[in-house]
Amino acid sequence: MTLRPDITTMRNYQYASSIRWGLSAIKLPSNLGITSSELNARCFSTSIPKFSTEESTIENRGNIIYQPGVTKYAGQHTFMFYETEDSLIAKFINSYKQKTWKDLSGVQEPSRNLKADLKFSLLTSMDVEREAYNMYGAWVKDYDATELGSSNSEIIKYTVTFQYDYFLRV
């Protein structure tokens, strides 16, 4: 085994591109005013879901060792969307808000009606799914939007954070 790959070895690989991915909804709450493909078409940035494993520390008479402890899902995942003139992303966020905390009354739908199941897929260069992550029990927790101004023509962007229960690599 060589310690450093040569150019011939490197040329044999088909490297995975960071622009080949897709977002789809396995299940969306009703009456959000948006479809899975409309969300996907406006989504321009995200990351791969992650987990972390806590450590257990074992200390005995001056010796310390570590072993894997509890593994936890990050619990939150962020997607960035371009807004269109039909205000579809703003309406989606507001529809979610109305389901989780209705204006002036604080009425909330049952949580089973609020949660979505989202699928984040990584694609090959031929746009064939090569791996996917299903996020279960997702709902809109927070969002942020582009600051409006008067000196540029930047497109309005929404950063939407979803809280989720867990994800599986499928």
Regions found by a protein language model. Give the residues of each.
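Glycine-rich, low-complexity intrinsically disordered segments
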Residues: 1-170
